[in-house]
Amino acid sequence: MKHIILYVDLILSWLCLPLMAADKKLKIVPNGPQAKAAIEKEIRFRLNKATGTLTEADLGKVAALDLNRKKISDVGDLKGLKQVKWLWLNSNQIHDISALKELREITSLHLESNQLVDTDGLKELRQLKELSINHNQLRDLSALKDLTQLRYLDLGHNQLTDLSALKDLKLLNHLDLRNNPDLPNAEVSKIRAALPKCRIYSNPTK
């Protein structure tokens, strides 16, 4: 009986491994002191406000932020910046961008070289015209299907296999799909047919 119980426990532990991995993947690591200080410094620079309390009204005046290479892991610290239009978050440690859904005035967003596997959080950003999200691990583009104002989209260096979410983005004039090793040539052909006016860069291997 003891051996049976141990065997059942082992089976259950195997079954739980995918769930544990998923939980680990989805867990958002809070920004450390260095990242928080970098965010505040950039906000103060944009406002020309070196000292004093940063109020909600202050945050509403920020139109652009350059937060490249600031060791940011949690974009939740940006939720108050509801009027920001240009946001650079390249080369950070971000794998969850769901909090960006609050920033609905964004027109240009740069998320290159992070740890993203999906585009959740972008669905509500209907003013977005320029999106650079290359050098991630993207597989799911479903959140992009309603971003019909997009003109420029860089999806290079990801893990894409399905481009169907892009077929109705009729204003796109630049689409970079290079270095997605699992992207079938048939998918690229479908997008070329759906978006005949778009300049598409691709080197499919399948």
Residue ranges of predicted features:
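N-terminal capping/linker segments that flank leucine-rich repeat
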Residues: K2-W86, A99, G121, K170, ...
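Conserved hydrophobic beta-strand positions in leucine-rich repeat
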Residues: L65, L87-L89, L109-L111, L131-I133, ...
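Per-repeat structural element of leucine-rich repeats
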Residues: S73-D74, H95-I97, V117-T119, R139-L141, ...
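Low-complexity, polar/charged sequence tracts that form flexible coils or short amphipathic helices
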Residues: L78-G80, L100-E102, L122-E124, L144-D146, ...
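N-terminal/domain-start segments enriched in small and hydrophobic, helix-friendly residues
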Residues: L155, D162, L166-L177
